[in-house]
Amino acid sequence: MVENQKAMPQPEMRRIRRIHFVGIGGVGMCGIAEVLLNLGYQVSGSDLKASPVTERLESFGAQIFIGHRAENAANADVLVVSSAVNTSNPEVATALERRIPVVPRAEMLAELMRYRHGVAVAGTHGKTTTTSLLASVFAAGGLDPTFVIGGRLNAAGTNAQLGTSRYLIAEADESDASFLHLQPLVAVVTNIDADHMATYDGDFNKLKKTFVDFLHNLPFYGLAVMCLDDPVVREILPQVKRPTVTYGFSEEADVRAINVRQQGMQTFFTVLRRDREPLDVSVNMPGNHNVLNSLATICIATDEGISDEAIVQGLSGFQGVGRRFQVYGELPVEGGNVMLVDDYGHHPTEVAAVIKAVRGGWPERRLVMVYQPHRFSRTRDLYDDFVQVLADANVLLLMEVYPAGEEPIPGADSRQLCHSIRQRGQLDPIYIERGVDLAPLVKPLLRAGDILLCQGAGDIGGLAPKLLGSPLFAGAVAAGKGAK
């Protein structure tokens, strides 16, 4: 069991002692499981394979099952499931047969939030980074929040932590509309873009309305923090019948950034807030998109009474999030080194933001990009946008689409993407079949001073550490151990 257990504050959950997670290794599940372990609940969970995540939970006292079997859930008081799990799962089927409650992941998160000062971060892009920045700034302000994040907060070494204060900071997931379960006191909407459209029957208006409904889960005394630079957020703003504060680069925003300057991994800017002195801040992340994420954090921190000194400290001391422009280290090539970066971006808007950040922070360097599209349906729906943004790399290697459980869709694969990008005449992309060792393919393409970006939400996440440890890159230096 985790040390420093906190007493359980959820009166309605006193009868619940044994909580079972189906798919406990998932990024949205493991954090909630860890918080519940810290609260003193008996936690078990199943997954298809062991991982560092399941091993960590097991070390904290969770009972982990590899594989899904009916008997795994036999003694549970409640089952927690993600949207990827359906009633054909034997554990879910057993629970339903025995009248054991089966609740969505977001409903369990909402239960944790019920008796706390909830801060929920929603939006198509930037949720994980903004949530992580909030956790960092709140900690710098001495508030010790509980947080549940969709990525590993590097400073904490985890994506979830039970704090001692009344604050709970969490991501609000719109992909399956489950964020409608949450009832926070403060909510952020970073942006609204076309993604996960199957959830919304392909109707963008339905997606927009769902975000408005989410904000109306706030109490009448709550606060909606909204990015005025995003055209769709700006469009729904008049429909929101809750107190609001806006942020962005726009002169109309309540909290805005000026004098933005990027220097490699660091971004410097000045924050203007109504009736406050200008505040000079820096954050250890490149790109204007991370300035916006920082502004959302500053809005909430200011509203909660966190001092400017703590805001500056929390932002400048932020150590980043796993797979969000994560610098792995330096790869040796003839004449020098190549900076190796890993990133989770899997939507054209995210890809474009990262490319822009690279151009802004390292304008003299070439960008060599290994990209893996995520889902055939997303590739089909956003095909032209992918063609446009991926063509902006200097060198592009396209891995085959990571299916994420989907069947192939004709014309929505990486081979076709390569063809369409090639027709633009900007560069000649290289198609990579699944299972190919990339190190021998990548090395001849690299020059000293290049930035090698591995990007996507699928199993490409394992590529950067493989390259760092490849014999072809003997002498590679991991980040934090002398990397340039």
Swiss-Prot record:
SUPFAM superfamilies: MurCD N-terminal domain, MurD-like peptide ligases, catalytic domain, MurD-like peptide ligases, peptide-binding domain. It catalyses: UDP-N-acetyl-alpha-D-muramate + L-alanine + ATP = UDP-N-acetyl-alpha-D-muramoyl-L-alanine + ADP + phosphate + H(+). One of its GO terms (cellular component) is cytoplasm. ATP binds at G123, T124, H125, G126, K127, T128, T129. It holds the Pfam family Mur_ligase_C. Pathway: Cell wall biogenesis; peptidoglycan biosynthesis. Keywords: ATP-binding, Cell cycle, Cell division, Cell shape, Cell wall biogenesis/degradation, Cytoplasm, Ligase, Nucleotide-binding, Peptidoglycan synthesis. It is found in: Cytoplasm. One of its GO terms (molecular function) is UDP-N-acetylmuramate-L-alanine ligase activity. It comes from the Bacteria. Its main location: cytoplasm. Gene3D superfamilies: Mur ligase, C-terminal domain, Mur-like, catalytic domain, NAD(P)-binding Rossmann-like Domain. Its EC number is 6.3.2.8. One of its GO terms (biological process) is regulation of cell shape. Cell wall formation. Belongs to the MurCDEF family. This is UDP-N-acetylmuramate--L-alanine ligase. It comes from Pseudomonas fluorescens (strain ATCC BAA-477 / NRRL B-23932 / Pf-5).
